[in-house]
Curated annotation (Swiss-Prot):
Pathway: Amino-acid biosynthesis; L-histidine biosynthesis; L-histidine from 5-phospho-alpha-D-ribose 1-diphosphate: step 4/9. Coiled coil: none annotated. GO terms for cellular component: cytoplasm. It is found in: Cytoplasm. One of its GO terms (molecular function) is 1-(5-phosphoribosyl)-5-[(5-phosphoribosylamino)methylideneamino]imidazole-4-carboxamide isomerase activity. It comes from the Bacteria. One of its GO terms (biological process) is L-tryptophan biosynthetic process. Keywords: Amino-acid biosynthesis, Cytoplasm, Histidine biosynthesis, Isomerase. It catalyses: 1-(5-phospho-beta-D-ribosyl)-5-[(5-phospho-beta-D-ribosylamino)methylideneamino]imidazole-4-carboxamide = 5-[(5-phospho-1-deoxy-D-ribulos-1-ylimino)methylamino]-1-(5-phospho-beta-D-ribosyl)imidazole-4-carboxamide. This is 1-(5-phosphoribosyl)-5-[(5-phosphoribosylamino)methylideneamino] imidazole-4-carboxamide isomerase. InterPro entries: Aldolase_TIM, His_biosynth, HisA_bact_arch, Isoase_HisA-like, Isoase_HisA-like_bact, RibuloseP-bd_barrel. Its EC number is 5.3.1.16.
Amino acid sequence: MEIFPAIDLKEGRCVRLYQGEFSKETVMNEDPVAQAIIFEKFGAKRLHIVDLDGAVAGESLNLSVIERICKAVRIPVQVGGGIRSLVAVEKLFSVGVDKVILGTAALYDKTFLEEAVLLYKEKIIVGIDAKNGFVATRGWLDVSEISYIDLAKQMEKIGVQTIVFTDISKDGTLAGPNIEQLELLQKSVAIRLIASGGVASIQDVKKLNDMNIYGVIIGKALYEKTIDLEEVLEVTKLC
């Protein structure tokens, strides 16, 4: 199983939100580049970065920070948040990003998504963020009428190879991942799944590993030290 330490960017800083609420932010590190270096130092093999400002604005607003992170570490970096054009995708690849995560665009601009998948294949990941089972977009501010299962099936038909699934109600809560929704997703599509939201303990990670989930994104648990990065990397390596 792949472990993705998370860095959420807001106004150039590394923050964590509670259940996706922008008003409930906690600054975890004033210097996201330093945080990325720390994660790499403790053994991380890849990083997951979200441009929260970009997710709301519809364009990358932390590109310079993302570029600095890519230059500062030697591990692959995947980035999501506000990426809604091929130009934006190409710009991220040009500064060293390894994979790009499309969210809102996957729901509202299928032509762009299809072009991106055709051009970049497995380098394009789709992020599906769900609130009460329905897909949320534009920085989780809007909730659509499409279920996360239906969108995942559409993504599979288009040729998307990896999905990041987030249950918003679990995000930043340390309440454990939504196993039920993940199991349903596994039964519905044959795409690689990266679980995000609520992971609080080594036991949570083991449970996801036992389900053969491809990867897990860990944020608050690393910052709050309820999960030790070196330990979880060792555990998943042995499983």
